[in-house]
Amino acid sequence: MRQAARFAMLGALASAAMFATALAPAAQAAGFGVAKFEAGTCNGNETEVKSCEYTSPSSAFYTQAAGHPPWGLTGVEVAHTGTGSSRVPTGEPLKRLRVDVPPGLAADPQTLETCTREQFNKEPKGCPPGSEAGFVELEAVVKVLGVPVLAPPLTGKVYNLDQEAKLPLLFGIAVEGASPIVSAVHLILEGHVSYAKEPALEARGIPSGDFHEYFEINNIPPEVEVLGGVKSPLETLKSKLFFNGHAGNGNFLTLPSGCGAPSISTSYVEVESDSGEKGSTPTVPPVGIEGCSHVPFEPITEVIPGPATSEKTSDQPDGVITEVKVPQHEGAGEINTADIAEAHATFPEGLTLNPSAANGLEACSPAKIHFESSTPAECPGGSNIGKVKIETDLPPGSLAGNLYLGAPQGLPITGPPYTVYVVAESTYGVAVKVEGTIQPDPSTGRVTAYFTNTAAHPFNLPQLPFSSVVLELKTGPRAPLANPLGCGGAKTESNFIAYSGEGILKQFTPSFAFPTTGCPNPIPFALTQSATPANATAGAYSPYTFNLTRADGQQYLAQISTTLPAGLLGDIPSVTLCGEPQATTGTCTAASQIGVATVTAGAGTEPYPLSGPVYLTGPYDNAPYGLSIPVSVLAGPFNLGTVTTRATIKVNPNTARVTVATTNLPTIVGGVPVRLKTLKVEVNRPNFIFNPTNCGALATESTLTSTFGATQGLSSPFQVGACGALPFKPSFKTATSAKTSKLNGASLQVTLTQPAHEANMKSVFVELPKQLPSRLTTLQKACPEATFAANPVSCRPLGSEVGSATVVTPVLPGTLSGSAYLVSHGGESFPDLDIVLEGDGVKVILTGNTKITKGVTSSTFAAIPDVPVTSFVLNLPVGPHSALTAIGGLCLKPLQMPTTITAQSGAVVKQSTRISVSSCGVRILSHRVVGHKLIIKVRTLGAGLIKLKGTGLPTVSRRVSKSSTVTFKLSLTRGGLKALSKARRKHRKLKINVRVAFTPKQKGQFGSAAATTVTFKR
């Protein structure tokens, strides 16, 4: 099979430059060096080509870009003296010769048969006829009997020899003693590729490192036999070497595919004498290469899954095989394909970089590649991400190597574009070191590979054809790429730019499908979840761990909304909340940390682990609290910075259950799709999160959303134990005022307190005494359910607001406070008492279901959240829209409120709560004056001491053992009588303020007093 990259063999023609041209002196030349050097490609037959020189008409030259010229030749003449047959080379004899040919000028040794070096040295005529590559004509000077003699013209053949180690091109030149004077001469022409810089050569004006070919003859004999056996110095004078461009299969020689001025086809020759003296000169052909518009250019890129069965399966690591094929046109009359100057390949949609590849991954610095140097690459083993094989004009499979991940010198890889190095070496002395750029799409992760010439590497893609380049990525769970999630023939798109001359670009953009199998339809989205406390004791502080697991082949996770079990709460006041901008940048302090988040990312069985702290923040995205979860993406040689995920923390107003939700879960970082496999969040701050006090079956419930928009609901059981060990000793007190009226109704205050670390309340039932019924006119003003649901404040103008409440809870730094409303619900006989509490951005609604039976009002708060409450105070005041009214006096007898308080643990406290009535200790029922005597009737509630006094009246007291009505009869004292007499003289009446005080016998109760004014007339 024809190999594409041909090593320029025109330089082989320059081997003739070892033969000097003149025997006689030439007055114009002096010293060692080159007098004339010509190189080019010519038309014509074997006879016509012998006369092809720079002075020939332009029609004599072959100029078609990428074409196969009939002939390629070089002509070299060394410096000499004399003219005609008297020419003699000047300086010392030629020892070594080197010829450098233009980049892209190529020959294909594989198109010819080969001859072994052993056979050539023994008897060149024994080489296969198919190994003949051309012929030479030369002139040389020998000494016969000590006299310089220009030997008759010598001719010989050029044979293609077997390629050897470090020699990609090897030819034998056999001059078989056609002259009766000179014996046979056998020379070896060694060909190389200039892939490394040669500073010494460039100092002499000869370029290097641009992948042109150069050729050396190092075995020029210092002497030959003349006249059948006499040794004589050999001084070459002039030579022409002709390569048959149509030898072999007709395509032995190929011109560069780039067009331009003749200067781009410059060749160089360097000669060296026995003493080491050097001479060099360039040559520029009289005509340039043309016809680039006719050069075909049809490269193809194919991307196929790796060899393993799993590598053809969706969402699996894949040792993808990428092959760039360049069809060759090998016929003698055909124009070959253009060389590739730039290549872009966009991989199939969904075939993306795999985070799992970071496991054990290293990177190779440019210094370790040794660009522009013949030193082999010294990349660390961990940077090897694949293999490369290039099919060129070497034996099949001999140019091979590795694909390495690159990194800046001494620095981590901080983001796209990413660098790769293609390093291929051959035992035949050819090395290719190409830098590539990998640019993933930041939104989709779709990968595009770029191989271009750059300012740093102007010959990154040398002008050397090839028939095939195969890149085979590393296989296994750490493969650099992972397959698309879906099937359906995603396509590879490639774009190539040819070497086609100045200002001319030829582009070709083919697309080929990428086969992926094993795709269910539809693609499933069924993750698994677990959530457990470290300590399952009710009410205990315990770390809480939440896990999500996604199997390969599942849709990718984009959003999470997780509702914690009822009663699983955090002690927010114990944490310093992280503010802005620290929460956004993920730079909170340890005082805000409440846990750790760990993820594994990547396809396959070895996803890469990453972790970061979980910080509690202040308000975020309309939620009272939030989370900031910064994860430093340090993976192998990569440092892609810190990715901060934000989450909201909201509290359900009816259940007080906490919901944590994130809508910005990272799906692509640095152009790399995360392919999240597991997510683990551990809330492990000491004495922060504590368990419910309800031992019933609870659950952690999540709603997941995929990048495809699919949703999944998950529920993980959660249950604690030992609820019975929790104490439950709440204190429940109520109070009202005896100051009631028809206009403003009656008041009621409820105060509930509870020590810390007890079972939390679940429900409260109360039954009001008959003396405190619900107020009908207020019930009729109950707020409609829809209005309340839309905005409770809208209920105020309706007269539905009947009170206020305040709650202190240890889980919030401040207090919750708000209003109490009567709310009517469809189908219910009586409106509920709904209490709206707000504070620290949290809203909680407590619903009391109201019933009225035979004038007695009862209320049940049946669904109190499992939240610790330090104190709860409800005030239902008097007013035009009071919730309650009064029947009769509230001070006539004790008011009792049957009360049942049930704990989340199941414990029950039942009591008959006595309502404390203010403004009701003592009352003056009546009074009258008869002459100089006051008769006053007083009523008390309970046992105690009654004391009565007034100016001009005696102070009297009396103890009562129970609620009593006592009549006092008091006569004016002597002072009182004097005051009365004085008033009469002024024609006035005597008015005396009388005060009645009552001190209850029972300790802890407040005393009371009443007063009135009495009038004495005579």
Regions found by a protein language model. Name each.
Residues T973:
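Residue-level signal for threonine
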Residues C920-R958, R988-R1018:
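Extracellular glycosylation-rich, acidic/polar low-complexity regions of adhesion-
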Residues S15-A17, P25-G921, R1018:
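Ser/Thr/Pro/Gly-rich, low-complexity intrinsically disordered stalk/linker tracts of secreted
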Residues M1-A29:
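Sec-dependent, cleavable N-terminal signal peptides
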Residues G976-A979:
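Short beta-strands and strand-coil junctions in structured, solvent-facing domains, enriched
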Residues S964-F968:
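Short strand-edge motifs at loop-to-beta-strand transitions and within beta-strands
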Residues G906, A983-L990:
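Short loop/turn hinge sites at secondary-structure boundaries
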Residues L97, A343, I560, V764, ...:
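Residue-level detector of buried hydrophobic side-chain packing
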